């Protein structure tokens, strides 16, 4: 018969100090309850005796202990843990009785309670942090499913152990323990396959009794019960609002029950299908964990929770299989430990257990997630130096007052959505909370992991725009200028007798009304313009003044009327001039009066009345010689036109070009898209080609005055030298450098022309920064006239004969690549400044050479004008006519930015189309991962990437979308040639422009990763540019200089004339990803001292608050110091120093100017 014995060892005590009288313990997969107490994997109550009567809690509690079980003097099992509780019982003649509770070190987590935020970490990573904080390093994970990062995971007002159990249950993790000498290891698993298995099967013995040396199982009962048969979970994500996220999982082994027991729940706490499917299966496993169970008893001490074993010798063959121990209770008695006190009887051991079949997975009971009781207050945070920090969805980062671990910066939280008053598809209301604003945060379904900002509040520092309650009757919408001083405001005053609507624009105030605008003012109207006022009325103007009208002009007044001028007064009409009145008519002047006409000068006069003609003067001369006097003549200047407004339209569905088609079109030197015609609203009338519309009606209550006559167009129109920009001294219009003529070309704008030429041809639109303008600015030459309308093939008959003067600009560069660049660029310029004309009426060009060597070409309904090589040719009726004046090169020098060795219309189009640049980014992964990228692929990739970052012109994107919708497919096929397009599938350019919805572009952008893209192309980019990049050019742009013509002909950027880097230089900035490829320059910028880095997060927050208070109350002292500080850092001045300065900079000021106060703060 086998003999049993028990012993225990406690840290710090001699091995023989304590003897085991008995024990009662429980083990379970994950947590359970034992004797009314929480059991975190295992819990043992051990009865002890000792000859030492004065053992104290200090010697026992929180110490490591190990209970050992011997069989035939061989150690067969051990339980290692910590002493949670210790008690002293009776003191006998020889022994004192004690009792201790042995638990895992994991139970220490139940004594910690916390609130904090974990970001972008997997559940195993979070659990590891919890364990390591308590000094628990003996743990392991055996997981079948890869952990998915949780964007935002909050431990909210719960103990560390509850938080651990909640996360583990959500991910389907269970834990058990492996006991070894001197330690116990916490073991996490998510499948029964990962559990340890006993090396030997355990026999089953139905006939309990007698002396059996081998441990066995008896009293095994197998139980089957009906449970949930199907789980269906559902959730929602704002990133995919139309997607259902519905997940359904059907149970197995359901032959014994109905299959209609569905468990539905929402939200399912997932945001993608992969997690949704896993969570649904975990939920089903939990709900069916009692469907197939077994209970039994044994005397095998090797049985432990979290272990598998094989059963044998059962009379039912189906029971002889593998099983998983889910929970087990152990009992042991050792009465002979007290033989001196009369103890007698054999040492015994037994256990009772619960099992599940080995192929099933046990899931822990899901723990309830803490619910947030109500709204919270938080502060909007972001990087130092920023005022507004948001993402593409308008989400912001926030910091909660209870968050002790974050530094109150952009790492404090996930992106948090912001409730807006109105949110539709590209319409609604948007107001981004700014850094430092206090916001009200609520939580979807009370879930602390799903915060949403639902309101904003003022506090003692952020006060309302007007003092209260003094201005309690005001309703105000006031903004604040970003990175500057000022505000925009719309406010309403509702005090009786003082009602007012107030509107303040810090800079410009623009408005666009698509139809009528009616204003009724029932009292006075005052208008003060402190600079110029421009008004343009494109149809009729009716003005009725029912009392008197006065005008005072301190300078000159010019009135120019193309038609007739009719003036009618009811009584007297008086014209008085200080010096001269000059009346001139082309044919006749008639002055008629009912009773009298008098002409008076000096003392003489001529009077005509019914009595006759009376002449009176000192001397009356008739036919005595002399000459008539002359007047000054008309010398008035024409009024300038007002700045226009582009309509705020939604993005039209754009179109993309396949990358392969781009390369093919590039090789063929042909346009990839049709030239953009003028839109209807941009088209300007040819002379005498427009019938004026009837005058528009004027809304009541005032009756419209009757027009005297309808205006008629004249043959000598003044030039329209302006568009939607302000005039500058050197040229009529000025466009921002970010467009560099691209917007102008898309809108049908071309280069400037002299005023006399503009008069001759009616109208012309000009654009400073246009490529040809940059070449011809000094000579003020080069012109092109668009047709009056190119809508649906109409109005071709209104084309006039126009002069195009292309300036001869001989090539001075020997580099073959540079010469080719100019040829290709001129090809683009010429083909984009023409359009398709009526096929039946085009004529060849007639070359005329001017005396100064320039080309003067008469264009009469030409189909194409193409400049290439050393001549200019016209394609007409299948013939090519080349015209080259003697001794001159026709190649025009290229000064337009962005033209590299592949100066093709396709790449030019890329530069002007932000939506295309963005859509191309989705192709980077496959393009940049290919081996042996050639220069063309690399150039296109880098070019598109850089332009997508640095040419984000929203209005341009909108405009481009409008125009591309109005383009018609090119009528002719792309003709293959020896060098280019040979793909028979691509028959015209329109086939490579499939439409792409704006929402799709947004989706592509959200998935793109610029850094990953740059990582792929970095080696090729570095090898291409690192050695040949000109240091002088880079420094030239750093110093604010401009390469002539915004191009690369006067500044060699590498040996490839890179369009990518030329664009960067145009913006005088280089992204961090490319800095390593640029020449290093000596930097005089000092590094900023980071005083606050020395403090822990709690201390840092306190220091920042006190420093901020000192700075805000410093008057202008801090502002002056900050200005000198920025000067020392080679940074430009700012106006709002207290808002722009970082916390470290403010701390530096306190330390320098008030060191005693600084020492008090940090102490």
Swiss-Prot record:
Residues 728-1163 form the ACD domain. Disruption phenotype: Deletion leads to a loss of TseL secretion and in turn loss of its ability to mediate prey cell killing. One of its GO terms (molecular function) is ATP binding. Mg(2+) 1 binds at residues 743, 889, 1066. It is found in: Secreted; Host cytoplasm, Host cytosol. Mg(2+) 2 binds at residues 743, 805. ATP binds at residues 739-743, 808, 995. Its main location: secreted. Keywords: ATP-binding, Host cytoplasm, Ligase, Magnesium, Metal-binding, Nucleotide-binding, Secreted, Toxin, Virulence. Its cofactor is Mg(2+). GO terms for biological process: actin filament depolymerization; isopeptide cross-linking; isopeptide cross-linking via N6-(L-isoglutamyl)-L-lysine. GO terms for cellular component: extracellular region; host cell cytoplasm; host cell cytosol. Binds 2 Mg(2+) ions per subunit. Can also use Mn(2+) ions instead of Mg(2+). InterPro entries: ACD_dom, Gp5/Vgr_OB, Gp5_Vgr_C, T6SS_RhsGE_Vgr_subset, T6SS_Vgr_RhsGE, T6SS_VgrG/RHS, Vgr_OB-fold_dom_sf. Its EC number is 6.3.2.-. Part of the type VI secretion system (T6SS) specialized secretion system, which delivers several virulence factors in both prokaryotic and eukaryotic cells during infection. Forms the spike at the tip of the elongating tube probably formed by hemolysin co-regulated protein/Hcp. Allows the delivery of the TseL antibacterial toxin to target cells where it exerts its toxicity. Also acts directly as an actin-directed toxin that catalyzes the covalent cross-linking of host cytoplasmic monomeric actin. NCBIfam families: vgr_GE, VI_Rhs_Vgr. Belongs to the VgrG protein family. Interacts with protein VC1417. This is Actin cross-linking toxin VgrG1. It comes from Vibrio cholerae serotype O1 (strain ATCC 39315 / El Tor Inaba N16961). The lineage of its organism: Bacteria, Pseudomonadati, Pseudomonadota, Gammaproteobacteria, Vibrionales.
């Amino acid at each position: 018969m086998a003999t049993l014995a028990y012993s225990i060892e406690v840290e710090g005590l001699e091995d023989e100090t304590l003897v085991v009288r008995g024990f009662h313990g429980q083990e379970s997969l994950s947590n359970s309850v034992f004797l009314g107490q929480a059991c975190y994997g295992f819990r043992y109550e051990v009865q002890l005796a000792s000859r030492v009567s004065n053992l104290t809690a200090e010697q026992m509690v929180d110490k490591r202990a190990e209970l050992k079980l011997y069989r035939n003097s061989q150690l067969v099992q051990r339980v290692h843990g910590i002493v949670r509780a210790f008690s002293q019982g009776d003191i006998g003649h020889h022994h004192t009785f004690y009792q201790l509770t042995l638990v895992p070190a994991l139970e220490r987590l139940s004594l910690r309670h916390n609130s904090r935020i974990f970001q972008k970490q997997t559940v195993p990573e979070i659990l590891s942090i919890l364990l390591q904080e308590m000094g628990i390093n003996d743990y392991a994970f055996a997981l079948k499913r890869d952990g998915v990062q949780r964007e935002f995971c909050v431990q909210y007002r719960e103990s560390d152990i509850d938080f651990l159990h909640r996360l583990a249950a959500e991910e389907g993790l269970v834990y058990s323990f492996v006991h070894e000498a001197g330690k116990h290891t916490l073991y996490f698993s998510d499948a029964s396959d990962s559990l340890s298995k006993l090396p030997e099967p355990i026999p089953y013995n139905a006939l309990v009794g007698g002396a059996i040396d081998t441990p066995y199982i008896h009293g095994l009962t197998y139980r089957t019960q009906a449970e949930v048969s199907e789980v269906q979970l559902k959730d929602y994500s704002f990133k995919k609002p139309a997607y259902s996220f519905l997940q359904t999982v059907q149970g197995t082994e359901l032959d014994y029950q109905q299959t209609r027991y569905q468990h539905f729940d929402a939200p399912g706490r997932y945001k993608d299908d992969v997690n949704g499917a896993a969570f649904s299966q975990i939920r089903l496993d939990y709900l069916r964990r009692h469907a197939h169970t077994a209970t039994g008893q044994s005397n095998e001490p090797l049985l432990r929770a979290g272990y598998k074993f094989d059963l044998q010798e059962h009379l039912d063959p189906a029971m002889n299989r593998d099983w998983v121990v889910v929970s087990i209770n152990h009992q042991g008695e050792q009465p002979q430990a007290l033989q001196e006190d009369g103890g007698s009887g054999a040492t015994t051991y037994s256990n009772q257990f619960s099992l599940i079949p080995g192929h099933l997975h046990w899931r822990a009971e899901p723990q309830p997630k803490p619910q947030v009781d109500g709204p919270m207050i938080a502060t909007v945070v972001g990087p130092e130096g920023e005022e507004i920090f948001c993402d593409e969805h308008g989400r912001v980062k926030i910091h909660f007052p209870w968050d002790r671990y974050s530094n109150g910066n952009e790492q404090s939280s996930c992106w948090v959505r912001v409730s807006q008053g109105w949110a539709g598809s590209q319409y609604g209301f948007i107001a981004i909370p700014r850094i430092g604003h206090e916001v009200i945060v609520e939580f979807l379904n009370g879930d602390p992991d799903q915060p949403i900002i639902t309101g904003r509040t003022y506090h003692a520092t952020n006060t309302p725009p007007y003092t209260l309650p003094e201005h309690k009757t005001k309703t105000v919408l006031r903004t604040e200028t970003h990175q500057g001083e000022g505000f925009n405001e719309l406010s309403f005053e509702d005090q009786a007798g003082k009602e007012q609507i107030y509107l303040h624009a810090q800079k410009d105030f623009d408005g666009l009304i698509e139809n009528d605008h009616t204003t009724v003012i029932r009292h006075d109207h005052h208008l003060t313009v402190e600079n110029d006022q421009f008004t343009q009325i494109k149809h009729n103007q009716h003005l009725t003044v029912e009392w008197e009208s006065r005008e005072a002009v301190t300078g000159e007044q010019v009135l120019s009327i193309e038609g007739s001028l009719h003036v009618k007064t009811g009584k007297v009409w008086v014209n008085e001039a200080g010096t001269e009145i000059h009346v001139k008519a082309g044919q006749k002047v008639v002055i008629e009066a009912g009773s009298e006409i008098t002409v008076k000068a000096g003392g003489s006069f001529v009077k005509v009345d019914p009595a006759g003609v009376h002449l009176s003067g000192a001397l009356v001369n008739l036919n005595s010689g002399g000459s008539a006097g002359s007047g000054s003549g008309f010398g008035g200047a024409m009024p300038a036109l007002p700045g226009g407004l582009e309509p705020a339209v939604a993005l039209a569905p754009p179109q993309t070009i396949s990358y392969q088609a781009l390369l093919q079109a590039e090789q063929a030197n042909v346009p990839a898209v049709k030239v953009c015609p003028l839109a209807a609203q941009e088209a300007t009338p040819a002379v005498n080609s427009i019938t004026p519309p009837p005058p528009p009606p004027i809304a009541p209550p005032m009756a419209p005055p009757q027009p005297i006559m309808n205006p008629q167009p004249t043959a000598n129109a003044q030039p329209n030298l302006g568009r939607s920009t302000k005039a500058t001294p050197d040229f009529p219009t000025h466009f921002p450098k970010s467009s560099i003529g691209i917007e102008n070309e898309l809108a049908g704008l071309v280069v400037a022309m002299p005023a006399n030429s503009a008069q001759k041809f009616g109208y012309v639109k000009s654009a400073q920064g246009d490529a040809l303008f940059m070449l011809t600015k000094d000579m003020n030459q080069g012109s092109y006239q668009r047709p009056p309308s190119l809508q649906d093939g109409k109005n071709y008959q209104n084309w006039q004969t126009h002069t195009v003067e292309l300036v001869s600009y001989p090539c001075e560069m020997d580099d073959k690549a540079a010469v080719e660049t100019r040829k290709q660029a001129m090809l683009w310029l010429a083909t984009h400044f023409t359009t398709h004309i009526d096929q039946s009426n085009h004529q060849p060009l007639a070359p005329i050479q001017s005396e100064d060597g320039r080309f003067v070409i008469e264009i009469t309904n030409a189909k194409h004008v193409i400049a290439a090589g050393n001549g200019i040719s016209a394609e007409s009726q299948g013939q090519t006519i080349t015209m080259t004046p003697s001794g001159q090169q026709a190649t025009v020098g290229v000064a337009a930015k962005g033209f590299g060795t592949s100066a093709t219309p396709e790449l030019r189009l890329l530069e002007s189309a932000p939506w295309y640049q963005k859509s191309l980014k989705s192709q980077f992964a496959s393009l940049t991962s290919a081996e042996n990228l050639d220069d063309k692929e690399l150039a296109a990739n880098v070019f598109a990437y850089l332009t997508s970052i640095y040419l984000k012109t929203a209005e341009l994107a909108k405009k481009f979308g409008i125009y591309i919708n109005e383009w018609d497919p090119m009528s002719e096929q792309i003709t293959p040639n020896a060098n280019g397009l040979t793909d028979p599938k691509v028959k015209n350019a329109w086939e490579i422009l499939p439409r792409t919805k704006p929402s799709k572009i947004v989706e592509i952008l959200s998935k793109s990763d610029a850094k990953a893209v740059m990582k792929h192309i970095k080696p090729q980019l570095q090898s291409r540019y690192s050695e040949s990049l000109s240091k002088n050019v880079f420094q030239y742009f750093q110093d604010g200089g401009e390469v002539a013509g915004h191009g690369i002909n006067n500044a060699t950027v590498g040996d490839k004339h890179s369009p990518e880097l030329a664009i960067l230089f145009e913006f005088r900035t280089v992204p961090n990803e490319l800095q390593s490829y640029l020449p290093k320059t000596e930097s005089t910028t000092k590094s900023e001292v980071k005083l606050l880095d020395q403090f822990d997060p709690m201390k840092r927050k306190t220091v920042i608050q006190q420093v901020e208070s000192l700075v805000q109350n410093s008057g202008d002292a801090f502002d002056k110091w900050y200005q000198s500080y920025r000067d020392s850092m080679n940074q430009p001045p700012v106006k709002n120093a207290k808002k722009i300065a970082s916390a470290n900079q403010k701390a530096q000021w306190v330390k320098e100017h008030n060191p005693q106060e600084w020492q008090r703060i940090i102490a």
